[in-house]
Amino acid sequence: MKRTGILLVNLGTPKDSSKTEVRKYLKTFLSDRRVIKIHPIIWKPILNGIILNIRPKKSAKLYQKICTENGFPLLEYTEKQMENLKNICPEVEVTIGMSYSEPSIETALDTLLSKEIEELNVIPMYPQYSGTTVGSVFDSVMNYFIKSDRIVDIKFIRSFYNNPQYIDYFSKKINEALNESPIDAIVFSYHGIPMSYVKDGDNYPKECTKTTKLIMDKLGDIRYYQTYQSKFGPSEWLKPATDDTLKKLPSKGIKNILIVAPGFVVDCLETIEELEHENRNYFLENGGEVYKYVHPFNGDIEFAKLVKDIISL
């Protein structure tokens, strides 16, 4: 049997919630050509001259709000899933890598290759494919091996938006919440991307829609909405927007909702601050009454079992 390695990849977090560290993180993130497709000659002056002089202060305050004694949830839960995988797959080398912070993907691959692995399984922790996330991870992994004298067998998981265990997990979590109290509708909120990326061929929204449909097929006849959050910049993004939708629902008689974000494997700034707090306030301030958020896997070992199933260990 080949000596196998698993690399779990997530977005990353600032080193801490200081303005300086948040600025470093944002600069790395917003310099990725997969994330921002504007030509560097145009984009760099905007990034360095405007965005990085304004956004870090605001973002630092938000990161301070979500930071716990264990650090930032995204890193905490990603590390927990690494430990879960090590426990259920003791014969496999497992590590994590972050696209825009430490431990970097390069550092993670150095670690795995030092263990003399022969087969590498790369799992971007994004259920739905997008060039802005999974595509960027692919670039980083391939760029690493372009410079390496040693190549191993590589299995790259493009997406798992329709994996039965993944669909079952969210369906069960939603059902548990529905059994606690009646609701008027379910709101599925996915991270948005620019419409221009979709027109260029990114099929992310198709996979989001398929995920929603597969979950709803298990839930039955319940009203639901699919929305997109976290818009950045002036360009057109996927619609409808989560915040706009939540502001309007109470006027339509929908005052008790369940909100779920299947595009997120672990809680992070976008779910904790945007969905649990900011968007909750929008909904309640506009006449909403009950707002319940369904958490993703976080530290639940079911995600590690899902990964094991995906790579057929």
Swiss-Prot record:
Pathway: Porphyrin-containing compound metabolism; protoheme biosynthesis. It catalyses: Fe-coproporphyrin III + 2 H(+) = coproporphyrin III + Fe(2+). Fe(2+) binds at H191, E270. GO terms for cellular component: cytoplasm. CDD domains: Ferrochelatase_C, Ferrochelatase_N. Its EC number is 4.99.1.9. It is found in: Cytoplasm. One of its GO terms (molecular function) is metal ion binding. It comes from the Bacteria. GO terms for biological process: heme biosynthetic process. It holds the Pfam family Ferrochelatase. Involved in coproporphyrin-dependent heme b biosynthesis. Catalyzes the insertion of ferrous iron into coproporphyrin III to form Fe-coproporphyrin III. PANTHER family: FERROCHELATASE (PTHR11108), FERROCHELATASE, MITOCHONDRIAL (PTHR11108:SF1). This is Coproporphyrin III ferrochelatase. It comes from Enterococcus faecalis (strain ATCC 700802 / V583).
